[in-house]
Amino acid sequence: QKLQHLKTKDPLGKKPIYYRGNRQDLPFYDIDLNLLRFNPLNDRIHTDIKEYEQTTGMDFNLLPITKMNTIISEMIWSKHESKNKKTLEDIKRKNQLEVGVVTKDGLIVDGNRRFMLLLKINEESSENRPFRAIILDETYDDDPTSKFNIKLLEMDIQDGEDTKEDYSAIDKYIRVINFVD
């Protein structure tokens, strides 16, 4: 609802993406970080969550969203700390340059790492930097077709750009299992 309200305002610009079988120029907006959450369906994050559940014996989905965000943030930071430190300094200096993608309920489709870094910047400096992103008109939970199309978009974004981090063998395996489900 707050995200949908943002879409009634003038966008900051448009970004081309390939979505639902077409190239589309979709508007993007600055979104308050409090309206967003990490995507536990993201293949890399999902792998870490499964490991967390195995280690702690806890069902991750039963945790409050703020606790989920904190745990996922720590997972992302510690996985590639030196790379994250470099990108953190870059975002501090230049702001967020790459536009992310979120669902209409605030789940991040593309940009989990940038979201984590912006949370860290805001926490350390008491700034209120927003997350710049396209807001999709659907969620993973709307229907199976929506979930399928959003996963295809996520895969296209992750695999379609040279600058994205490579997936490990386990992440690729989990991706295939999750895609088939």
Show where each model-derived region lies:
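Amphipathic, charge-rich alpha-helical segments that serve as recognition/docking helices
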Residues: 72-78, 123-181
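Short, charged/polar connector segments at secondary-structure boundaries
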Residues: 1-129
